[in-house]
Amino acid sequence: MTNMETTAQAGSSVRVWMACLLLIFPTTVIGPKVTQPEVDTPLGRVRGRQVGVKDTDRMVNVFLGIPFAQAPLGPLRFSAPLPPQPWEGVRDASINPPMCLQDVERMSNSRFTLNEKMKIFPISEDCLTLNIYSPTEITAGDKRPVMVWIHGGSLLVGSSTSHDGSALAAYGDVVVVTVQYRLGIFGFLSTGDKHMPGNRGFLDVVAALRWVQGNIAPFGGDPNCVTIFGNSAGGIIVSSLLLSPMSAGLFHRAISQSGVVISKILEDLNAWSEAQNFANSVACGSASPAELVQCLLQKEGKDLITKKNVNISYTVNDSFFPQRPQKLLANKQFPTVPYLLGVTNHEFGWLLLKFWNILDKMEHLSQEDLLENSRPLLAHMQLPPEIMPTVIDEYLDNGSDESATRYALQELLGDITLVIPTLIFSKYLQDAGCPVFLYEFQHTPSSFAKFKPAWVKADHSSENAFVFGGPFLTDESSLLAFPEATEEEKQLSLTMMAQWSQFARTGNPNGKGLPPWPQLNQLEQYLEIGLEPRTGVKLKKGRLQFWTETLPRKIQEWHREQRSRKVPEEL
């Protein structure tokens, strides 16, 4: 059978799988269909709206901007989230909520994943809200799996509304929840003590998951079948929630797309030093944590987001992370829930280069530029300067012309920050007994041709539009809308929605008519996701061996040599 025949057969099988899904979950409606659906929750009544989805008659009830915590205003700006207050009457949940405070210009830089028409919403500190997308058909006695999406954006930018869950809800027959959390200094700056505890952005997501447990049933969701999933920083948060005792029992499956907490770009920092540096930049320097926080509380929120030179990360030795994530992993101190995770084949193809302000340097890149652009990240990893050329040599194995040098830098940055940490994390999960499903997304979306160079392959976050059914979204101003998708890309989106929702439903992405996806075991098999999916073996085996065996050995040898040189000098 040819590849084209195999692809056509797989496409037909997925359509049959989707049709069977709609038969298994019948479309008998309890009560009349209304364009402004209303739902009673323990906190009050909400009124949403109904939207359609392309290529299906199914409708989706959408509820936007529902608060899952009290607004973190005034003295609550740097506090852990508090439970939401009930409201009187009917709350309007039909309009898009504001985004959390962030640098909107930087947000607009990261919008061009697939849709350059994406709306940018207003910003506000009153932003701890979530959106719910639920198929209108409610079957008596049955509850749908719940998929809670955590957006990415380097913990600095992003919003829940930019990820429209209507197509995934309709085609996957799941309830999709998208959440917001405090970003930047509002979510992560810390004095390292009680005056400004860290990890507030993570705690916001925990609060949202608690809200889901107590409130999702009236929307047709099953609180006992919750999957958390996220991309980039969202994937980092998903993996963090797995390790935190605070989120125990709040979810039952997890998906990390291009992001895990052991990434080298996210290390626990000297919290007090970082807080002082930031405070000095806004004229709030103080030797006292209490005074520093009081000064920051007096500032206008929008004035605080203009300062870009601040390191954002998690803190340890608190209620969220009692120990460093690596130690929690090594000690297997986490629940063994089914876990699906993966990367793209060109993580630093374009988007992250643009976000990091180094895209303009990529056209004419010399070997000297390669080392210069890599040096800050390698230094952050505490790599001795004498060892850095070893890393460069490893990545220049395909030549030294400009295109090879550019590709070497892209691969190096992608491996350090995302790919190798994901592979290491998957090994920890497997050793602990989690059912693990690994993927590499390999398809270059056809829309890239409009604004990305021809050398960009499957860029960072490019799978999101397929997971969320971008070709089938009716709102073409949504970040992930993909109206120009080819027929093959539509089929890929249908397949990925089926796989992700099947995983949410059963803890396994395999199903009748879907491409076989092997569970990770000693064979180290994974799924190569593209127009013609296939099974791969030992993803980036050589690079993983370099970072986990070869390079550590060379560093040890270098340190031994340094010590041996010091002994004669001391004598």
Swiss-Prot record:
<feature type="disulfide bond">
    <location>
        <begin position="100"/>
        <end position="127"/>
    </location>
</feature>
<feature type="glycosylation site" description="N-linked (GlcNAc...) asparagine">
    <location>
        <position position="398"/>
    </location>
</feature>
<keyword id="KW-0325">Glycoprotein</keyword>
<comment type="function">
    <text>Involved in the detoxification of xenobiotics and in the activation of ester and amide prodrugs.</text>
</comment>
<keyword id="KW-0378">Hydrolase</keyword>
<keyword id="KW-0719">Serine esterase</keyword>
<feature type="short sequence motif" description="Prevents secretion from ER">
    <location>
        <begin position="568"/>
        <end position="571"/>
    </location>
</feature>
<dbReference type="InterPro" id="IPR019826">
    <property type="entry name" value="Carboxylesterase_B_AS"/>
</dbReference>
<dbReference type="GO" id="GO:0005788">
    <property type="term" value="C:endoplasmic reticulum lumen"/>
</dbReference>
<dbReference type="GO" id="GO:0106435">
    <property type="term" value="F:carboxylesterase activity"/>
</dbReference>
<dbReference type="InterPro" id="IPR050309">
    <property type="entry name" value="Type-B_Carboxylest/Lipase"/>
</dbReference>
<feature type="glycosylation site" description="N-linked (GlcNAc...) asparagine">
    <location>
        <position position="311"/>
    </location>
</feature>
<comment type="similarity">
    <text>Belongs to the type-B carboxylesterase/lipase family.</text>
</comment>
<dbReference type="InterPro" id="IPR019819">
    <property type="entry name" value="Carboxylesterase_B_CS"/>
</dbReference>
<keyword id="KW-0256">Endoplasmic reticulum</keyword>
<feature type="active site" description="Charge relay system">
    <location>
        <position position="460"/>
    </location>
</feature>
<feature type="active site" description="Charge relay system">
    <location>
        <position position="347"/>
    </location>
</feature>
<feature type="signal peptide">
    <location>
        <begin position="1"/>
        <end position="31"/>
    </location>
</feature>
<dbReference type="InterPro" id="IPR029058">
    <property type="entry name" value="AB_hydrolase_fold"/>
</dbReference>
<keyword id="KW-0732">Signal</keyword>
<protein>
    <recommendedName>
        <fullName>Carboxylesterase 3A</fullName>
        <ecNumber>3.1.1.1</ecNumber>
    </recommendedName>
</protein>
<feature type="active site" description="Acyl-ester intermediate">
    <location>
        <position position="232"/>
    </location>
</feature>
<feature type="glycosylation site" description="N-linked (GlcNAc...) asparagine">
    <location>
        <position position="317"/>
    </location>
</feature>
<dbReference type="Pfam" id="PF00135">
    <property type="entry name" value="COesterase"/>
</dbReference>
<feature type="disulfide bond">
    <location>
        <begin position="284"/>
        <end position="295"/>
    </location>
</feature>
<keyword id="KW-1015">Disulfide bond</keyword>
<dbReference type="InterPro" id="IPR002018">
    <property type="entry name" value="CarbesteraseB"/>
</dbReference>
